[in-house]
Amino acid sequence: MSVLKQPLANPSRIRGIYRYLLQAKGQREKTKVLARSLSPDKLVENKPTPRPMFEACIKECIKCGLLIEEEKEEQTEIVINPDLSEEARKPGTGDELLPNTLADLFFTLDNEDEYDLGLVCAWYLSQDVYEPPGTWEAVEQKVAEQKVGELLKMSNNTLYGQMDDWMGYMGLLWGHALGGKRFIIPDPTLYLKRNLKYLFKQSGEKILLR
């Protein structure tokens, strides 16, 4: 299951977990302590499944390689993956770079779990920016018109909401309100602005726009 199909794993929750661990000693925390810090016991009293959102987010973070789980003294700990770049792990820059870090992890060639997210992002970015499908109803209609339903499997409003959340967080679309309703527009400008310095690393290199 990818973040596209796991509605409990959204950017704000994963960001909250990562921000906590960035400041934690050794960038690690016991799983039980982390769970109770982010989702206090009082809030989950008498719930059939105490912390489904926390568990879903941790699972997705481990699966994509953002975090790892380690056994220590008969307890599990959640740790920021030491294989991430130094800048991604720094307390001063890790939070700001998290959209890039997650995009890199999601779209790496060997991450088959997020293949469907990559397809949806590529499809939405290919839509006409002047007349984009900006609501779930419009997306549903456009998917049917273009006969890509089997490919994208965008079959309900929940999946659309996840697309909106994740593409927006990574800087691949933006949204605005009109008549009390949210509309989205495919636009990777924010993502490109964040990544130009990594794409063109040579000092003084000129970029020609045609």
Kindly give the residue locations of the regions a language model identified.
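Donor-sugar nucleotide-binding helix/loop cap in glycosyltransferases
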Residues: M1-R210
